[in-house]
From Swiss-Prot:
Membrane topology: Peripheral membrane protein
Protein name, per record: ATP synthase gamma chain
Pfam families in the cross-refs: ATP-synt
InterPro entries in the record: ATP_synth_F1_ATPase_gsu (IPR035968), ATP_synth_F1_gsu (IPR000131)
GO cellular component: plasma membrane; proton-transporting ATP synthase complex
GO biological process, one term: proton motive force-driven plasma membrane ATP synthesis
Record keywords, A-Z: ATP synthesis, Cell inner membrane, Cell membrane, CF(1), Hydrogen ion transport, Ion transport, Membrane, Transport
GO molecular function, one term: proton-transporting ATP synthase activity, rotational mechanism
Top-level taxonomy: Bacteria, Pseudomonadati, Chlamydiota, Chlamydiia, Parachlamydiales
Amino acid sequence: MASLREIRKRLQSIQNIQQLTKAMEMVAASRLHQVQIKVKQAKPYVVKLSEILDRLSQITQDIKHPLLEQREVKKVGVVIVAADMGLSGPYNKDIFSAANKFLKTYAQEQVELILVGKKATDYYKKRPWNIRFEFGEWGEKLTSHQIKTFANQLMSWFLIGELDEIWLVYTHYVTMMTRKVMVEKFLNIQQISPKSEKSPVDYIFEPNPKQIYGAILFNYCMTKFQSILNESYASELAARIFAMKAATSNADDMIEKLTLVRNKVRQAGITKEMLEITSGAEGLK
């Protein structure tokens, strides 16, 4: 059995770790609250843009735009959105599992990866995939300007023909308890069907619909991409909260068990000393 000093040292170590996991849980909860607001605010905007684009498509059925172009697929870009750090349970593992399953549907030479998050870079640099672009340290550090630049770059690669399709692998945030890894096509843009059962609004477009279609389409892509990044970050934080909560709970169990062992060892030591004193006293008689 370990000595009393060793048990106390281990107990102190676990208590220190528990303080750290509690702090990380609180920080993640605070950040999640801020990101949840962004996710909630973006959804109505994306839906409304979808409705406008859908209405434009209906009244100008012959409309054409480069972002809608469907062409022979020679090069595919796959954006994989993971975390910058671990300590978030199976969050990163689930993303890589879904991404790898999707990547198997293409020949290796067809695919170029666009990696978001240090964990994605660390994972795929060890594997035989072509990496076009890496973006680390994102999360709360990512500004609106950087997101706009990133989305513009994706659209540029598609428009100049360097990539014929662009797919996104990310985590869709539903609730604190519910998250789902999604594999979703970003470009070319498919027919947009807003999830609304309301009667279509009869918009008055000024200037004419064809002139404003492209601008709204670009705005839609920007907003959609920003929304996806926010959802991924919210999912990461939610996963980290649960992981840290579980770690804190496990630390409680270990502290309880070690405290019991410490008390037993201390009691055994006291009993041993008492026996030695009693034996010594008997020997002096």
